[in-house]
UniProtKB/Swiss-Prot annotation:
EC numbers for this chain: 7.6.2.-
Family: Belongs to the ABC transporter superfamily. Heme (hemin) importer (TC 3.A.1.14.5) family.
Domain ABC transporter: 3-243
Full protein name: Hemin import ATP-binding protein HmuV
Membrane topology category: Peripheral membrane protein
Subunit structure: The complex is composed of two ATP-binding proteins (HmuV), two transmembrane proteins (HmuU) and a solute-binding protein (HmuT).
Organism superkingdom: Bacteria
First-tier enzyme category under EC: translocase
Cellular component aspect of the GO annotation: plasma membrane
Subcellular locations according to the entry: Cell inner membrane
Record function comment: Part of the ABC transporter complex HmuTUV involved in hemin import. Responsible for energy coupling to the transport system.
Keyword check for Cell membrane: yes
A GO MF term: ATP binding
Organism expressing this protein natively: Myxococcus xanthus (strain DK1622)
Length: 267
């Protein structure tokens, strides 16, 4: 059981923006997807979520092609936090979190839905915002409330199959403390048997929280493995154009990347 991409390619016009690519997201892991701007990270996430149709290949959710799942059944298994979430109505933060319970409730929300939404707000440090209008929140607060919605959506273990959480730059608008809080919530989701794919730009956050890292460049996976195996001075210089030191740090679960400056261009 996994969320798997097999031989996918995405073409736009005459240009290929992603692939060919094979990648598997396993239950119990946090998989960080890193790479420079334009490498195809968000395109990959869109393909894995079903938002973007692949030109070739397929995406399998627990062994079944993603597009063959009924929307409600798929939503109970697969949750997505996009880079930006627009909402034009003055819902409270609690009401936004409750939106994630829609696949589980055919009628009005019950006590179990409310409990799941409140627990999700607790996980993202937004419970104190529960009665606030979403439209009055800061960008970082909105992002955390939207994560609460997705956590509430995936809060219930399934009788069969697994739960998959796809996060597109979940730390982009957050302060330092909340960056770690959000990734700690993702790690707990994985520890509970879920699977997390997170698109990240911060290599140190990726190294700290991810079990595996997929490094993308020009629409392809160029390295895949544990952070300690993947991150090297040579790789960061080649893929990101940056000179760094990669060191072990006492107490850190992954290596530490220390920037030194832009790497010289290589032919």
């Amino acid at each position: 059981m996994s969320l798997e991409v097999r031989g996918i390619e995405v073409w736009r016009g005459r240009g290929r923006t992603l692939g060919p690519m094979d990648l598997t997201l396993e239950p119990g892991e946090v998989l960080a997807v890193v790479g420079p701007n334009g490498a195809g990270k968000s395109t990959l996430l869109s393909a894995m979520s079903g938002e973007l149709r692949c030109s070739t290949g397929e995406v399998l959710l627990d062994g079944t092609p993603l597009l063959q799942w009924k929307p409600r059944e798929r939503a109970m298994r697969l949750g997505v936090l996009p880079q930006e979430s627009s909402l034009g109505f003055g819902f409270t933060a609690l009401e936004v979190a409750l939106l994630g319970r829609s696949p589980h409730s055919s009628r009005a929300e019950g006590s179990a839905d409310l409990a799941a939404a409140v627990a999700a707000l607790d996980a993202t440090d937004t419970r104190h915002l529960a009665s606030r209008s979403y439209l009055t929140l800061s960008g970082g607060e909105r992002q955390r409330v939207q994560l609460s919605r997705v956590l509430a959506q995936l809060s219930e273990p399934l009788a069969s199959g697994h739960r998959y959480l796809l996060l597109d730059e979940p730390t982009a608008s957050l302060d330092l403390a909340h960056q770690h809080l959000v990734l700690e919530a993702a790690a707990r989701f994985a520890q509970a048997g879920g699977a997390v794919l997170a698109v990240l730009h911060d290599l140190n956050l990726a190294a700290r929280y991810a079990h595996r890292m997929a490094v993308l460049a020009e629409g392809r996976v160029v390295e895949l493995g544990a952070p300690a195996q993947v991150l090297s001075q040579e790789l960061v210089a080649r893929v990101f154009g940056l000179r760094v030191q990669v060191v072990e740090w006492p107490g850190s679960p992954g290596p530490l990347v220390i920037p030194e400056g832009r790497a010289p261009l290589t032919p």
